[in-house]
């Protein structure tokens, strides 16, 4: 019973671990040795001897044989010195090797009668009664077929270039294997190489006995060999005899393809050459390439302006050039209005009870408003119309005697004279007017568009008080149009007025000429070495009337100066003619400009220039020295 347990253990171990030739799986041998030693305590290994099993092999799965090495101190010449014993499952005792001769020297051959497939075997090698080596295996695990036989080849095809050829290699299975009956299934592996080479090339395993070989060179010789193994095992048998393949001699011209053109070197050198050429091209044309890839940003240019002026910072010249164009105007050339905006509130009933606009215009506040240096800035945070820089600029222009302001001055004097004329007629009818003779020639201070410019004449204080008395007279104010409808306000600060009515009472216009309000001959306070030609013309024109009423002779500070006057004698001749021209009706101005905003509902308007009766005063302002003025005076 113990023997059968041992055989069962060996069978289970042999199913998982295969015994191969001269070496067995160590785990399998260990388990088998331990089992044998348990069953047979006398089975021991003689470690001092050199005898051992080399391999056990079955060529066809029907028979097998085992081989061992001969020790240095042992020889088969001494019968019974070395023995091999075996045991299997169906035999319950150890038996000696059945054939020591058929398999060769130091071997034991088991024919088909002693071979059982799928049955575990255990063998031991003894020398002089001691166990030298032992192992266990199964027959199907030690199969190593014999080499194939009948190896040959057949030419299949030759290429059109007569350089390559295809062949078919055939062989026969080992003669001792029953492949046809299916007792054993073999796999074949073919190796080939060129003659004089050392490394064999291997093809994939095949189950057939033939394999094609493609693209073999006709000018080469090849060697072919084949070996086989049982399917699903790893151990191959021996190689067959080497088959030498030699193709028939071909035309020598067909072997010209042996010379392989060095395409690889040409490609490498070509890439290097192109790289060097590209670098040289980039280096030589780097500026142009840079402009193509990164075009320069165009320099900003203004037509008609030299860029050097902008670089050097000459802004005055740039502004002068830009001022030529209509779409550009320097900030100093803009017409600054006195008031940038007007805030009107006509819905406040409390403001109506404070007084009429006429009283507000003719009150003392109006006279005080002429002193614009003390005016308060009420423009709600906007740029003040009374800033010093604007005032200095305007007064400077007026002091330099702008031609436009001098031309408009006689018109304003004439318009105010008409107003005073109406007032004088009303005063002549009252008893209080007898004390104020008309020959006093009052001087009226008009509000010019740029600045107040009073004419310095004799008796200024007395005439100013008389005029103030006349303007504050309610009877005289009833006949004057102090109101006009505002139809529009221009962006420059001008007010567009609707045409007003003439005298409401129908009184005839005063025949008094504008000479009443024209400045008389008086002492001229000469602040500089010259004064305006327009003042000289006015003085000459009024000289005859003034001499009859004034006893003050003009006196001038004499200085050596240059003269830039024109047409003084002509002006003196024309002055008499201008006096005889009858005064026509003064048209009501359609436009005026705002001078001062006294309250949300009160406006102080500038005197508007009226049409000139004489075109001669449109000439530019000239300068007259005091010496020449004394000479031309009558």
From Swiss-Prot:
One GO MF term: cytokine receptor activity
Key words of the record: Cell membrane, Disulfide bond, Endocytosis, Glycoprotein, Membrane, Phosphoprotein, Receptor, Secreted, Signal, Transmembrane, Transmembrane helix, Ubl conjugation
Keyword Signal: yes
Glycan attachment points: 46, 73, 111, 152, 157, 196
Pfam families cross-referenced by the UniProt entry: EpoR_lig-bind, GHBP
Membrane topology qualifier: Single-pass type I membrane protein
Disulfide bond residue pairs: 56-66, 97-108, 122-136
Transmembrane segments: 261-284
Modified residues (Phosphotyrosine): 483, 591
UniProt domain Fibronectin type-III: residue ranges: 147-250
Modification Phosphoserine, positions: 337
Region (Required for JAK2 binding), start-end ranges: 290-375
Intervals of motif WSXWS motif: 236-240
Motif, Box 1 motif: chain positions: 293-301
Reported modifications of this chain: The soluble form (GHBP) is produced by phorbol ester-promoted proteolytic cleavage at the cell surface (shedding) by ADAM17/TACE. Shedding is inhibited by growth hormone (GH) binding to the receptor probably due to a conformational change in GHR rendering the receptor inaccessible to ADAM17.
Membrane-side (Extracellular) residue stretches: 19-260
GO CC annotations, alphabetized: external side of plasma membrane; extracellular region
Listed PROSITE patterns: FN3, HEMATOPO_REC_L_F1
SUPFAM superfamilies noted in UniProt: Fibronectin type III (SSF49265)
Subcellular location: Cell membrane
GO biological process, one term: endocytosis
Location, primary (coarse class): membrane
Family: Belongs to the type I cytokine receptor family. Type 1 subfamily.
Function text: Receptor for pituitary gland growth hormone (GH1) involved in regulating postnatal body growth. On ligand binding, couples to the JAK2/STAT5 pathway.
Entry's free-text remark on domains: The WSXWS motif appears to be necessary for proper protein folding and thereby efficient intracellular transport and cell-surface receptor binding. The box 1 motif is required for JAK interaction and/or activation.
Name the UniProt record assigns to this protein: Growth hormone receptor
Organism this protein belongs to: Ovis aries (Sheep)
């Amino acid at each position: 019973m113990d023997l059968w347990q041992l055989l069962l253990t060996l069978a289970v171990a042999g199913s998982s671990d295969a015994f191969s030739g001269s070496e067995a799986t160590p785990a399998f041998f260990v388990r088998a040795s331990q089992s044998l030693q348990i069953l047979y305590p006398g089975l021991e290994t003689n470690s001092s001897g050199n005898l051992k099993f080399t391999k056990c092999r079955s060529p066809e799965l029907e028979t097998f044989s085992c081989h061992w090495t001969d020790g240095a101190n042992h020889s088969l010449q001494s019968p019974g010195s070395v023995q091999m014993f075996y045991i299997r499952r169906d035999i319950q005792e150890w038996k000696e090797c059945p054939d020591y001769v058929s398999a060769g020297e130091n071997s034991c051959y088991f024919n088909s009668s002693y071979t059982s497939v799928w049955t575990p075997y255990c063998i031991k090698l003894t020398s002089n009664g001691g166990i030298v080596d032992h192992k266990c295996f199964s027959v199907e695990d030690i199969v190593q077929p014999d080499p194939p036989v009948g190896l040959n080849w057949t030419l299949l095809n030759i290429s059109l270039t007569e350089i390559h050829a295809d062949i078919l290699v055939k062989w026969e299975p080992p003669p001792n294997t029953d492949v046809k009956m299916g007792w054993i299934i073999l796999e074949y592996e073919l190796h080939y190489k060129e003659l004089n080479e050392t490394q064999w090339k291997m093809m994939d395993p095949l189950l057939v006995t033939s394999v094609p070989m493609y693209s073999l060179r006709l000018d080469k010789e090849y060697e072919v060999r084949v070996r086989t193994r049982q399917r699903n095992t790893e151990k191959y048998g021996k190689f067959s005899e080497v088959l030498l393949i030699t193709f028939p001699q071909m035309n020598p011209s067909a072997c010209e393809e042996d010379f392989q053109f060095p395409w690889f070197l040409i490609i490498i050198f070509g890439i290097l050459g192109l790289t060097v050429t590209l670098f040289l091209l980039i280096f030589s044309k780097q500026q142009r390439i840079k402009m193509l890839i990164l075009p320069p940003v165009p320099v900003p240019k203004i037509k008609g302006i030299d860029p050097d002026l902008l670089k050097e910072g000459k802004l005055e010249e740039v502004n002068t050039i830009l001022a030529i164009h209509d779409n550009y105007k320097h900030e100093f050339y803009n017409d600054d209005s006195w008031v940038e905006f007007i805030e009107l509130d006509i819905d406040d009933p409390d403001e109506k009870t404070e007084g009429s606009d006429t009283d507000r215009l003719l009150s003392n506040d109006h006279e005080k408003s002429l002193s614009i240096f003390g005016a308060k800035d009420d423009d709600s945070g906007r740029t003040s119309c009374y800033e010093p820089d604007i005032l200095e600029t305007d007064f400077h222009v007026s002091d330099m005697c702008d031609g436009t302001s001098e031309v408009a001055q006689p018109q304003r004097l004439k318009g105010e004279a008409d107003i005073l004329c109406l007032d004088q007629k009303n005063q002549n009818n009252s008893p209080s007017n007898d004390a104020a003779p008309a020959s006093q020639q009052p001087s009226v201070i008009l509000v010019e568009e740029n600045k107040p410019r009073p004419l310095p004449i004799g008796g200024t204080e007395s005439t100013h008080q008389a005029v103030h008395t006349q303007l504050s007279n309610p009877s005289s104010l009833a006949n004057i149009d102090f109101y006009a409808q505002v139809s529009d306000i221009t962006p420059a600060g001008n007010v567009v007025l609707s045409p007003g009515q003439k005298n409401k009472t129908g009184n005839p216009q005063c025949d008094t000429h504008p000479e009443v309000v024209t400045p008389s001959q008086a002492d001229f306070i000469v602040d500089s070495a010259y004064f305006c030609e327009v003042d000289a013309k006015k003085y000459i024109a009024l000289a005859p009337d003034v001499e009859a009423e004034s006893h003050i002779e003009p006196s001038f500070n004499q200085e050596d100066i240059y003269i830039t006057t024109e047409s003084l004698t002509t002006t003196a001749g024309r002055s008499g003619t201008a006096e005889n021209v009858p005064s026509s009706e003064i048209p009501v101005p359609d436009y005026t400009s705002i001078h001062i905003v006294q309250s949300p509902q009160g406006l102080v308007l500038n005197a508007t220039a009226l049409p000139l009766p004489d075109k001669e005063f449109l000439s530019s302002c000239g300068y007259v020295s005091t010496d020449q003025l004394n000479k031309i005076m009558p």
